[in-house]
């Protein structure tokens, strides 16, 4: 049985269906890309003088409809399907022709070449009448060719196959063509070409002309040819690998040193402040553990070991001393009552309360210490010009000079102590009347307390606020027996080994306390509680505080003693007023009258 063999050409690996090429050998050949009119619209240029038409050419859908019934002239084609490179045969039988003879050179095919999937049978249909009467087709040039029968068999089989393709979904034609760019082409040189409306020229071209697209050759011997669509050089793998290997700079990390400060202790990265100083997490934890555990360190060198990021763990003594030197405050370390609560304050009560005074700075004890240091004379600038340790001095001179000296020392201390009181956090926020009342009521107590803390009772040296140093015997005629009580109190106070922080709190508590006649006693009480808590925290975690559980009680017990000494001072002033040897200054007289207990 005669059969027509269809050639299956090999397509390059990875080729898409849109890139497969079809070639039809005959005078009436059509490209398979034009067989999908729902995706491609084109115009036809009628340039062949042998074909004339009075009206426009029929639409492409008309041609396709005619394929279903048959044409008098069926376009011959050679259908080339780029699949796998294997050969298969299409069997044609029961073909009845009208006045046509099979060409003698058609090679017979054997049954062994039939595909295993089965045979495909086709039958011709009756010739239809052209839909356009004025469209004339020349028949004689096609059938005069001796090999026209062979071409007709091929055309009929390919045409029927194209009709079957119309019944199945057709992938959209690709209007873009891609070319392999030569090696070394830069990535930015990629181009894309898009052709305009497709034209179908009717001029015949020489048979056997060839076109090369993307390295594949196909023959276009018929008058209808598909022009090249466009070129788009492909991106070479070498350039792509270079782009992938290029390292993109990453954005700066959140914890980079450029966005943060440095630790004041070791120089490591520090995000925020801890205990009053910008420090790293390591130095913060070291300082916290040292203060809470009251740790004692010993330097094995000369107490000047380098403390940096690399050597900060070598000497704990020098590291802790540097923490204190840069300003870290021990009193800010959390107490036992706040451990495990992340420093959260108690929840606010639902009931409204009176507005509290502005919160003092976090380092309250540091402010108290600073105020005390600023209000005391430096040890290098003391005035020893009037100091005499001769016991006969108390017998020399008259009482007027000693009484005037007594008044001068009191008035000179009053201005200095007032300046110290104004530096206490929260004191300046109180009403002015309450400030004056607290200061005047506690002036003599503060005078005695500060004098007792500065003086050296063993040597009998009394150091006053203005820097004047006098011997105890030089003050007996002016101060009377009051000076002996002051020296005794100084001796007991210094035996307690009170540090400057605890003493600053005691001095503040001597003034900020409950007094008769306060306008806002609640605010004074709140400020007093803050100072008491600050003193308690300091004593609890201070060196030696844990070994002396009654140390805080002894410190607070000095306040009633000051009240007794203040009463003795008022009695001395009252006696001098009665003696009337030297009139007291107005400020001392007012102080005496305002602070009388009766």
UniProtKB/Swiss-Prot annotation:
Tissue expr: Brain.
Main site of residence? cytoplasm
User: The NR LBD domain covers which part of the protein?
Assistant: 360-595
Q: Which residues bind DNA?
A: 260-335
Set out the biological process GO terms recorded for this chain's protein. Answer: adult locomotory behavior; cellular response to corticotropin-releasing hormone stimulus; cellular response to oxidative stress; central nervous system neuron differentiation; central nervous system projection neuron axonogenesis; DNA-templated transcription; dopamine biosynthetic process; dopamine metabolic process
> Motif span (nuclear export sequence (NES1))?
443-452
Fetch the SMART domains from UniProt: HOLI, ZnF_C4
Ranges for region Disordered = 1-22, 337-361
GO terms for CC? cytoplasm; nuclear speck; nucleoplasm; nucleus
Q: Which SUPFAM superfamilies match?
A: Glucocorticoid receptor-like (DNA-binding domain), Nuclear receptor ligand-binding domain
UniProt biased composition (Low complexity): 8-22
Q: Where is this motif: Bipartite nuclear localization signal (NLS1)?
A: 287-314
Task: Name the PROSITE patterns for this protein.
Answer: NR_LBD (PS51843), NUCLEAR_REC_DBD_1 (PS00031), NUCLEAR_REC_DBD_2 (PS51030)
Motif Nuclear localization signal (NLS1), residue numbers:
338-350
GO MF terms, alphabetically ordered: DNA binding; DNA-binding transcription activator activity, RNA polymerase II-specific; nuclear glucocorticoid receptor binding; nuclear receptor activity; protein heterodimerization activity; RNA polymerase II cis-regulatory region sequence-specific DNA binding; RNA polymerase II transcription regulatory region sequence-specific DNA binding; sequence-specific DNA binding
* Quaternary structure, from the entry: Interacts with SFPQ, NCOR2, SIN3A and HADC1. The interaction with NCOR2 increases in the absence of PITX3. Interacts with PER2.
So what does this one do?
Answer: Transcriptional regulator which is important for the differentiation and maintenance of meso-diencephalic dopaminergic (mdDA) neurons during development. It is crucial for expression of a set of genes such as SLC6A3, SLC18A2, TH and DRD2 which are essential for development of mdDA neurons.
Task: Name the family the entry cites.
Answer: Belongs to the nuclear hormone receptor family. NR4 subfamily.
Q: Any idea what this protein is called?
A: Nuclear receptor subfamily 4 group A member 2
Species = Mus musculus (Mouse)
Q: Name the gene.
A: Nr4a2
């Amino acid at each position: 049985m005669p059969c027509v063999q269809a050639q299956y050409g090999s397509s390059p690996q990875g080729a898409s269906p849109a890139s497969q090429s079809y070639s039809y050998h005959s005078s009436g050949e059509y490209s398979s890309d034009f067989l999908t009119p729902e995706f491609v619209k084109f115009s036809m240029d009628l340039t062949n003088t042998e074909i004339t038409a009075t009206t426009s050419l029929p639409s492409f859908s008309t041609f396709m409809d005619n394929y279903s019934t048959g044409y008098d002239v069926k376009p011959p084609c050679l259908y080339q399907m780029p699949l796998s490179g294997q050969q298969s045969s299409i069997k044609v039988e029961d073909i009845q022709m009208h006045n046509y003879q099979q060409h003698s050179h058609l090679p017979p095919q054997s049954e062994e070449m039939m595909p295993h999937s089965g045979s495909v049978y086709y039958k011709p249909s009756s010739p239809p009448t052209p839909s356009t009467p004025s469209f004339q087709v020349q028949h004689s040039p096609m059938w005069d060719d001796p090999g026209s029968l062979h071409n007709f068999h091929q055309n009929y089989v390919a045409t029927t196959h194209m009709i079957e393709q119309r019944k199945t979904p057709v992938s959209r034609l690709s209007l873009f063509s891609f070319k392999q760019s030569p090696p070394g082409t830069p990535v930015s040189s990629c181009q894309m070409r898009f052709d305009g409306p497709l034209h179908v020229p009717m001029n015949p071209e020489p048979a056997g002309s060839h076109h090369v697209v993307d390295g594949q050759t196909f023959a276009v011997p018929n008058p209808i040819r598909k022009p090249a669509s466009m070129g788009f050089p492909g991106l070479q793998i070498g350039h792509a690998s270079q782009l992938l290997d290029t390292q993109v700079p990453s954005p700066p990390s959140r914890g980079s040193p450029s966005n943060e400060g440095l630790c004041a202790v070791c120089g490591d990265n520090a995000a925020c402040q801890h205990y009053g100083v910008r420090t790293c997490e390591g130095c913060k934890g070291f300082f916290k553990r040292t203060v809470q555990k009251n740790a004692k360190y010993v330097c094995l060198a000369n107490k000047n070991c380098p403390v940096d990021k690399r050597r900060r763990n070598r000497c704990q003594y020098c590291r802790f001393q540097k923490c204190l030197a840069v300003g870290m405050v021990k009193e800010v370390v959390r107490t036992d009552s706040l451990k495990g609560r992340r420093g959260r304050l108690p929840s606010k009560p639902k009931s409204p309360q009176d507005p509290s005074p502005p919160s003092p700075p976090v380092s309250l004890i540091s402010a108290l210490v600073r105020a005390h240091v600023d209000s005391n004379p430096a040890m290098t600038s003391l005035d020893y010009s009037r100091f005499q340790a001769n016991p006969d001095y108390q017998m020399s001179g008259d009482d007027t000079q000693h009484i005037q000296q007594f008044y001068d020392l009191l008035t000179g201390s009053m201005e200095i102590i007032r300046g110290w009181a104004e530096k206490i956090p929260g004191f300046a926020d109180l009403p002015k009347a309450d400030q004056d009342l607290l200061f005047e009521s506690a002036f003599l107590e503060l005078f005695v307390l500060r004098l007792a803390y500065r003086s050296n009772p063993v040597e009998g040296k009394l150091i006053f606020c203005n820097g004047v140093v006098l011997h105890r015997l030089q003050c007996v005629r002016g101060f009377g027996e009051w000076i002996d009580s002051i020296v005794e109190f100084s001796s007991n106070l210094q035996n307690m080994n009170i540090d400057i922080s605890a003493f600053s709190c005691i001095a503040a508590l001597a003034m900020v306390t409950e007094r008769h006649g306060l306008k806002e006693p609640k605010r004074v009480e709140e400020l007093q509680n803050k100072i008491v808590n600050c003193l308690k925290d300091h004593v609890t975690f201070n060196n030696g505080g844990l070994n002396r559980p009654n140390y805080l009680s002894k410190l607070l017990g000095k306040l009633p003693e000051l009240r007794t000494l203040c009463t003795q001072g008022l009695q001395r002033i009252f006696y001098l007023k009665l003696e009337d040897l030297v009139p007291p200054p107005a400020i001392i007289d007012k102080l005496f009258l305002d602070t009388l207990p009766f």
